[in-house]
Curated annotation (Swiss-Prot):
Protein name: tRNA-specific 2-thiouridylase MnmA
Functional note: Catalyzes the 2-thiolation of uridine at the wobble position (U34) of tRNA, leading to the formation of s(2)U34.
InterPro entries: MnmA-like (IPR004506), MnmA-like_C (IPR046885), MnmA-like_central (IPR046884), MnmA-like_central_sf (IPR023382), Rossmann-like_a/b/a_fold (IPR014729)
E.C. code: 2.8.1.13
Cystine pairs: C113-C209
Coiled coil, from the record: none
GO biological process terms held by the UniProt record: tRNA wobble position uridine thiolation
Binding site for ATP: A19, M20, S21, G22, G23, V24, D25, S26, L45, G137
Chief location bin: cytoplasm
Database matches in Pfam families: tRNA_Me_trans (PF03054), tRNA_Me_trans_C (PF20258), tRNA_Me_trans_M (PF20259)
Length: 370
């Protein structure tokens, strides 16, 4: 199978840098780049090396992944280099992750990683190497429409990663290539097997790669011990219903773990108040949000003032909304919207841009005022 990397040069004069994580997706991208006849260089960033993650299936950019990337590079016959970006990753991703949780928000570290370490630091390395583009294994499409570069969702909706890439700038998108955006994952694994790549059936990486056991609260508490302090669980009128063991164990919309008995209806986490160490709970209806204030907005288009579709979680269905440059107003109340999450804007399959949710305004229901 051949892929057009959309480089306006003879194939023999092209140089492509591939971000190789050690997984099947980026390995196939490297093989596709090599097959074009372009000079292909594989680069892996060492982002962390937690002992528990090194041998764990589903980690990313730890020790075993680096070895897998090197083995693939040797198999397809391309040079491979490893750059230590552990300090950059800690400062721009892990520290931000911790501070957001401590502040009672819900972070999305994969977006910060793409925004900083991958599409800033690694992209700069590719430019310094004289590459014509940086290719990655992300499932998203880069299309050229009337000489304008656009980002579109992957053809396979189950694999689409556009939510995590909204912060990509126009300049970065112009330089990036995403060869797998039009392919289903089974086809990619099939291609890897046909090429004899050892990673053909390797497990996919996890969303939070630096949390080897899934216990993100432990990571936060290790970095910020006071974050594990307990406090009161209160209802929306401020009445104390119970105690919690630390706000870092909870997110907006959560039900499990509250351990509050004797209630007439199920209670959900409505809000976290770090200043008072209070966990505010209420009925599901209280989760309804009418609008959200958005910060750090990044546009991939020159302007858009019509109704759009918005995703406030990666797995959520897009919902209709309008954005005036500051406030995102939902057509219908949206549930479980948490400060710290990303709001990504779409027009059909095209990614318009997005931003970070700073504050939310609840929808008003008469029976919640009692």
């Amino acid at each position: 199978m051949s892929i057009d990397f959309q480089i306006d040069k003879p194939k023999s004069a092209q140089r492509i840098v591939v971000a190789m994580s050690g997984g099947v997706d980026s390995s196939v991208v490297a093989a596709l780049a090599k097959a074009t006849g372009a000079e292909t260089i594989g680069i892996t960033l060492q982002l962390y090396d937690h002992g528990a993650a090194v041998g764990r299936k589903g980690s990313c950019c730890a020790g075993k992944d680096i070895r897998d990337a090197r083995a693939v590079a040797e198999k397809i016959g391309i040079p491979h280099y490893v750059f230590d970006y552990e300090n950059n990753f800690k400062e721009s991703v892990i520290d931000d992750f911790v501070s957001e949780y401590v502040a009672g928000r819900t972070p999305v570290p994969c977006i910060r990683c793409n925004q900083g370490v991958k599409f800033t630091d690694l992209l700069n390395v590719a430019r310094e190497l004289g590459a014509d583009c940086l290719a990655t294994g992300h499932y998203v499409r880069r299309l050229v429409n009337n000489d304008r570069v656009e980002m579109h969702r992957a053809l396979d909706p189950a694999r689409d990663q556009s939510y995590f890439l909204f912060a990509t700038t126009k300049e970065q998108l112009d330089y990036l290539r995403f060869p797998l955006g039009g392919l289903p994952k089974p086809k990619v694994r099939e291609m890897a097997a046909e090429l004899g790549l050892s990673v053909a059936m390797k497990a996919d990486s996890q969303d939070i790669c630096f949390v080897p056991d899934g216990d993100y609260a432990r990571i936060v508490e290790e970095k910020c011990p006071e974050s594990g302090q307990g406090g009161d669980i209160v209802d929306m009128q401020g009445r104390v219903l119970g105690k919690h063991s630390g706000l870092i164990h909870f997110t907006v919309g959560q039900r499990r773990g509250l351990e509050i008995g004797g209630q007439k209806e199920p209670l959900y986490v409505i809000r976290l108040d770090p200043a008072k160490k209070q966990l505010v709970v209420g009925p599901r209806q209280a989760l309804a949000v009418a609008k959200a204030e958005i910060k750090e907005v990044n546009w991939l288009v020159d302007g858009f003032d019509r109704e759009m579709q918005v995703k406030i979680r990666s797995a959520a269905k897009p919902v209709s909304a309008r954005f005036d440059g500051k406030e995102l107003v939902f057509e219908k109340p949206e549930y479980g919207v948490s400060p710290g999450q990303a709001a990504v804007f779409y027009d059909g399959d095209q990614v318009l841009g997005g931003g970070w949710i700073k504050e939310t305004t609840p929808a008003v229901f008469d029976d919640l005022a009692e």
